[in-house]
Amino acid sequence: IVPKEDEDISIELEKQFKNQGIEFATSAKISKVIHGKELSIEYMVEGKNEVFNCEKVLLGVGVQPNSDDIGLENLGIKTYGPGFIEVDEYMKTNINGIYAVGDINGKLPLAHVAFDQGVVAAETIAGENVEGIDDYSNMPKCTYCQPQIASIGLSEKEAREKGLSIK
């Protein structure tokens, strides 16, 4: 349920949520929400149609850039993936004088990261000698839930993919 965290953290969080009466359908595609005497959702998971009666629905879709129809293509600004704006370590786009900070650049969608990116962009614009951000692996991350989750550095999976040994 938290795919960017270590698997054991995700397993424990799901266990804690289930103890609170929360049920999950991950990788599900919701087709309909029905507001009747009860709240129900129709969804498909693993090729099967399901119906679930519930009190509330939380749909976690991740981060998607809101870059459609804002004219990026008219300016020739390079994007990648679902519409994230390509930037260098100083938050510069491929067009001189245009910068992109925060979720729109797809680097690490967290408020404190966007703040730091904004500082780098502003100081670069002001002509200051600034250190750019080219490594996001040691930025602290957190998930606001109960129990709380926080991490820094590589996940176990990322470390293994880099050929590092872990304990």
Please name every model-derived segment.
Residues V51-E128:
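FAD-site-proximal beta/loop scaffold in flavoenzymes
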Residues I1-K48, P109-F115, E123-E158:
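Rossmann-like dinucleotide-binding cores of NAD(P)H-dependent redox enzymes
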Residues E23-A25, F52, K167:
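General small-molecule cofactor/ligand-binding pocket signal
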Residues R160-K167:
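Cytosolic Rossmann-like ligand/nucleotide-binding regulatory domains
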